[in-house]
């Protein structure tokens, strides 16, 4: 990439907009008061939401957990998908180059629909996006097929607020397999339904684009996740139908799913905890590579309101780079960032001893 473009994007990053007070009159931009300020804050002052912050007062009730209720439809469908994906791996050498490039591009866009869309924009409100970007992200999210934005955000806010309890949809204390995929193969724990149902989701209910996706999600996901990625290689450059189905669709979809799931499983079990040793989430570079920047998980749980989800800007974090590029184009704004002083103070206060300095 030309140096002058990188400089412009870097300059856009340094001009991160920061909310300095709850919005009330004054200068307006997108209906909210904010100002550009190079001195980033360390405390969460988002006016939109608070239900993604950890609630230490919630504790699991004593007694044996309820009996697991298997969802056999999900078990069968997940098994068939991964069988198709494994077969797709054997077909990659016979695929046309265009098919491999198309599948990779589809994977990246799908991943951004989760990371930049459902996660950092709609679950945590760490930045704001104008309509063209929100439209792109809602389409990309539909391509990813990991539940609609509303349901994804509700589960994720519950994961943060009730982390490592039975009210956490993918509680890592129940083991690697459960937090990775098992939670999707059984009925939700009653605590997930109870506590998740009480979360404040009014910000998403008020967003017409999110509600439109939720209303038409089934036909949308069939088109964007399965039909389109199968037909495009087959029709446009003469790829075989089986290669299109098993590589561009099954393999690509399985990779996106597992990259996201590893954030819930591996990044809660393997890695180091420089910011907070008292929580299970960890920094995992390998997860960040696959999940386009979501592997800095100890930082993210310590500072869920930081749009970068990492202390280190673009380092193994394509999602942050993407958001900064959108900011350069004027499509993303009000990106929230934690000050270096606040990060260092948190490391000193709660970080693992091996990660502290000075």
Swiss-Prot record:
GO terms for molecular function: iron ion binding; palmitoyl-CoA 9-desaturase activity; stearoyl-CoA 9-desaturase activity. Pfam families: FA_desaturase. A motif (Histidine box-3) lies at residues 297-301. A motif (Histidine box-2) lies at residues 156-160. Fe cation 2 binds at residues 159, 268, 297, 301. InterPro entries: Acyl-CoA_DS, FA_desaturase_dom, FADS-1_CS. Residues 14-43 are annotated as: Disordered. Substrate binds at residues 74, 147, 154-155, 187-188, 261. One of its GO terms (cellular component) is endoplasmic reticulum membrane. Keywords: Endoplasmic reticulum, Fatty acid biosynthesis, Fatty acid metabolism, Iron, Lipid biosynthesis, Lipid metabolism, Membrane, Metal-binding, Microsome, Oxidoreductase, Transmembrane, Transmembrane helix. Residues 32-43 have a biased composition (Basic and acidic residues). Residues 93-96, 237-240 are lumenal. Its cofactor is Fe(2+). Residues 1-71, 118-216, 263-358 are cytoplasmic. Detected in brain and adipose tissue, and at much lower levels in testis. Detected in liver when rats are kept on a fat-free diet, but not when their food contains unsaturated fatty acids. Stearoyl-CoA desaturase that utilizes O(2) and electrons from reduced cytochrome b5 to introduce the first double bond into saturated fatty acyl-CoA substrates. Catalyzes the insertion of a cis double bond at the delta-9 position into fatty acyl-CoA substrates including palmitoyl-CoA and stearoyl-CoA. Gives rise to a mixture of 16:1 and 18:1 unsaturated fatty acids. Contributes to the biosynthesis of membrane phospholipids, cholesterol esters and triglycerides, especially during embryonic development and in neonates. Important for normal permeability barrier function of the skin in neonates. Belongs to the fatty acid desaturase type 1 family. This is Stearoyl-CoA desaturase 2. It comes from Rattus norvegicus.
């Amino acid at each position: 990439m030309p140096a002058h473009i990188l400089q412009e994007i870097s300059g856009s990053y340094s001009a991160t907009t920061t909310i300095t007070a709850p919005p009330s009159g004054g200068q307006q931009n997108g209906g909210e008061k904010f100002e550009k300020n190079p001195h980033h804050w360390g405390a969460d002052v988002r006016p939109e939401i608070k239900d993604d912050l950890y609630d230490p007062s919630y504790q699991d009730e004593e007694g044996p957990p309820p009996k697991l209720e298997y969802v056999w439809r999900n078990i069968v469908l997940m098994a068939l998908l991964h069988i198709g994906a494994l077969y797709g791996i054997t077909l990659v050498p016979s695929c046309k180059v265009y098919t491999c490039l198309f599948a990779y591009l589809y994977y990246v866009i799908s991943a951004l629909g989760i990371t930049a869309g459902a996660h950092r924009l709609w679950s945590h409100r760490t930045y704001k996006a104008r309509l063209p970007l929100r439209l792109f992200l809602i389409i990309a999210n539909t391509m990813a097929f990991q539940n609609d934005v509303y349901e994804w955000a509700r589960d994720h806010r519950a994961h943060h607020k009730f982390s490592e309890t039975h009210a956490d949809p993918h509680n890592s204390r129940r083991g690697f397999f459960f937090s990775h995929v098992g939670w999707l193969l059984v009925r939700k724990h009653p605590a997930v339904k109870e506590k998740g149902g009480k979360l404040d989701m009014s910000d998403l209910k008020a967003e017409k684009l999110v509600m439109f996706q939720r209303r038409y999600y089934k036909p949308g996901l069939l088109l964007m996740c399965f039909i389109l990625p199968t037909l495009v290689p087959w029709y446009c450059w003469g790829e075989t139908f089986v290669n299109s189905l098993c590589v561009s669709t099954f393999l690509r979809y399985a990779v996106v799913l597992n990259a996201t799931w590893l954030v819930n499983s591996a990044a809660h079990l393997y890695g180091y905890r420089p910011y907070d040793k008292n929580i299970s989430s960890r920094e995992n570079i390998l997860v960040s590579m696959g999940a386009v920047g979501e592997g800095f998980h100890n930082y993210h749980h310590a500072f869920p309101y930081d749009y970068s989800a990492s202390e280190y800007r673009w380092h193994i974090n394509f999602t942050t780079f993407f958001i900064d590029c959108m900011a350069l184009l004027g499509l993303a704004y009000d990106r929230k960032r934690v000050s270096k002083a606040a990060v260092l103070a948190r490391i000193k206060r709660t970080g693992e001893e091996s990660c502290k300095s000075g």
